[in-house]
């Protein structure tokens, strides 16, 4: 079965201050997130900022792996940069 996982990212207050001072800070994290998805051999379908959401970023991938396997991706995303991610939440869409 194919899935689309949307991982919504709320960044920390410290990260938000850095992001507001320099928009490249967020862009750099998104570029690294793209590399994480590529490393896990998943198809990137969405990368950016969700509209009208509490979270600042969203990473969307299309894959046939289970949610447990996708957890390895989110773990790597959490560890891109210390103190960047406050929390992440996943939305699953089955195809």
Regions found by a protein language model. Name each.
Residues 69-78:
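Short amphipathic alpha-helices in soluble, non-transmembrane regions
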Residues 1-56, 64-69, 93-95:
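Short S/T/G/P-rich N-terminal loop/turn motif that feeds into the first structured element of a domain
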Residues 55-58, 86-87:
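Short, surface-exposed coil-to-beta transition loops
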Residues 39-40, 77-81:
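Acidic-histidine catalytic/liganding microenvironments
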Residues 79-94:
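Conserved short beta-strand edge segments in small beta-sheet-based binding/regulatory domains
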């Amino acid at each position: 079965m194919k899935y689309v996982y949307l991982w919504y990212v709320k960044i920390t207050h410290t990260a938000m201050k850095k992001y507001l001072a320099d928009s490249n800070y967020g862009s750099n994290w998104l570029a690294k997130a793209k590399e994480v998805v590529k490393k896990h051999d998943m198809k990137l379908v969405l990368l950016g900022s969700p509209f009208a959401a509490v979270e600042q970023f969203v990473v969307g991938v299309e894959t046939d792996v289970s949610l447990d396997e996708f957890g390895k991706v989110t773990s790597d995303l959490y560890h891109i940069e210390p103190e960047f991610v406050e929390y992440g939440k996943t939305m699953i869409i089955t195809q």
